[in-house]
Amino acid sequence: MITAAMNQAARETYDSGGDLPAKGSRVWVTGFTREEYDAGTRLLELAGFLPTAFATGADAVLVPDPPTAAIIEDSERLGRKVLVLGMFRDAAKPPRRRAALEITEHSVRILDVTIERRSADSSGLLPAERFAHLCLDATFLTAARSVAIAAHSRLPCALEGDTAVTKTTAVLWVAHLCRQEAVRLNLNGQSDTGELVGRFVPNLNHAQGSPAAWRFWEGIVPDAMRHGRWVVLDELNLAEPQVLERLNPVLEQPPSLVLSEHTGERFGLGGDVAVAESFRIFATMNPAEYAGRSVLSPAFRDRWSLWSVLESPGEKEYRALLTRLVHGVHPQFVLDGVEWRAADSSPVHPNLASDGRIDGLLDAIASFHVAVAAAAGGDSGVTLGRARRERYVFTRRTMLAAMSLLAGLVDRGIDLEAAALEAIELVYLQRVQPGPDRQAVRSALRTVGLGR
């Protein structure tokens, strides 16, 4: 039993707590009703913290005021700061609210950037279903904003970030919204200049036995320059640097190109072919630390006028994605004093929304995913699959696959929690080797209350 003296000592420790934890710290929110919990997490987000429903890995705890002596003592023992709502209510000024996305017949606004929308023509465009799973959170819309600025200013734009942070999707989505045709080329270590600018290929339509058995195939870049398409070069730094340097004149302002591989046809000002007004070029890549990546020359990097390095998602972003999939609700976020949120979309898995246990399950899935992703190669080092030459990878795609399976199993009449365990077994557990690695994943499941 906690004595009155212990209670007073604990209270004095709390009262002398000093400054708030650093921005970006994970804060465990506990002891509140659901309505109070939502209000508390909102205040934490406005103040720059990362709220979580789980104690594991938290730097601080947010509790009702006054906090109990047990909470204070436990937090002091773990080196965890104790916070109450009053610390944030006074400082949190209600930000101005704006819709994160606005589409009219002739324009698209992404955050604070408005770009032109082409006349209606569905030919060559990606279908809307391609983007049904998108969660319009701060990271994704910031990337899309960079793409929109590049499109408006006719500047080459590169997006760099970890696997599955929606780099390519951001470019293709903006192109889709603008009714702009985009062509995508996945580069690799075997890519050559022929894929980019053109090469001679067999002329299969020519009369058999004719000496003119070859024709010049125009590569993806000059073809896009001629017809006004957007070019998306995926995995840019997997290609050899000398191959990429062939694009240097295309990245200049204004863009140009000489097809020396053929007849010397010149694209650009004063040339044989005018570059179409709507031509744009984009690139995506993983950081150079990834295996097999080339180090790009400073001169080549400098030619990409806009270069955006994207943040990797954390528990907050994964949880928002799950909410989007099940409820169709996009998250609110604050940038530069403005609170943004996109209008609700059709949920991808509406059959899950009616189960009263779903929100608690989504909390657990998000925390579990973050735990295994970090163990497989987070900032603190690899603890899962340490002896393997090829590390395990758990990304947004992993979670999307698990949720798709979960929804399908529930449709077949399987109980929600049983379906969740089955989906996780198939997508996560079977991905790792039996033995210590699989035991570690099961342990992560038990930590969030899902395992047996």
Range-by-range predicted roles:
Residues 1-100:
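DNA strand-break repair and replication-stress modules
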Residues 3, 7, 68, 94-97, ...:
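Short amphipathic alpha-helical segments that mediate assembly, nucleic-acid/protein binding
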